[in-house]
Amino acid sequence: PRNYCFHFTCMGTVKHHYAMIGTAHLEDGYPLYYDAVNEKGLGMAGLNFVGNAHYQKEEEGKENVAVFELIPWILGQCGSVEEAKKLFMRMNLTDTRFRGNLPAAQLHWMISDRNQSVTIESVQEGIRIHENPVGVLTNNPPFEEQMFQLNNYMHLSPKEPTNHFSDKLKLQAYCLGMGALGMPGDLSSQSRFIRAAFVKMNSVSGDSEEESVSQFFHILGSVDQQRGCCETKDGTFETTIYTSCCNMSRGVYYYTTYENHQITAVDLYRENLNGRCLACFPLIREEMIRRQN
């Protein structure tokens, strides 16, 4: 809510700010956001950027903001991507820990409003702002590399392919979907970026909110991580813990979890936006099955 106090490491206490809604890990009563959208319709999400993220020590004359504070710092005072870009020009992103046993997460971020998206990366050279024309971001590699790889897939099409192989051969498509032959199907973040970009930019949604929300989850379903298919070095499995989107005009936040495919909605405006206490809702993690008989 607007009057929840954010105690920033170097920037003091902010008692009044834009209200926001999102998914967070609550640590000692403080929301460590994975993603969020504010009441002005500005959204932000952080994704893994291990090995490439680089943060600075505190610097005099800059607005020093710790990584774990970044989402509320931006969404608390910015109503658009353009406002956020100006704020980043004054900012120094630090590696200050929330607590001793919680190291700074290595992330890069996508920030979006109704009109545009940008990717923010803090690297050795400093903070970099990239225009994001596809409105998609995954984990590593750096965003410029992700975008460059799209050049290798400019032949992909939702349409039925025609024969460019040779006019001496009578070649023809023998099933639907062959226009997308060659689209990577593996679970690497680079391949998921390509797949998500293609599906997002070619998908067709109905006009209603329900149809748009449904289509969003179908789009993200194309890059779902299934348990058992991506094993980490310590023997655990990478999975899609949750998937979310938000109607930026109405402040309705929708999500599913790995365990529950039913879409759950949380409405920002059904809470007291002028309150001082967090409104917390646990993620639903058991499958909700609608039985018809």
Describe the role of every protein-language-model region.
Residues 1-63, 90-91, 95, 282-284, ...:
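A contiguous strand-loop segment
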Residues 33-35, 108, 119, 243-245:
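Short, surface-exposed charged micro-motifs
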Residues 44-46, 129, 253-255:
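Short hydrophobic/aromatic-rich beta-strand segments that constitute the beta-sheet cores
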Residues 47, 57-67, 91-144, 148-149:
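Acidic/His-rich structured neighborhood in mature extracellular/periplasmic domains
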Residues 48-49, 123-124, 256-261:
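Secondary-structure transition/turn motif
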Residues 59-99, 103, 209-218:
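Proteins synthesized as precursors that undergo proteolytic processing into mature forms
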Residues 87, 96-99, 104-105, 113-116, ...:
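C-terminus-biased signal that marks the final domain/tail of proteins
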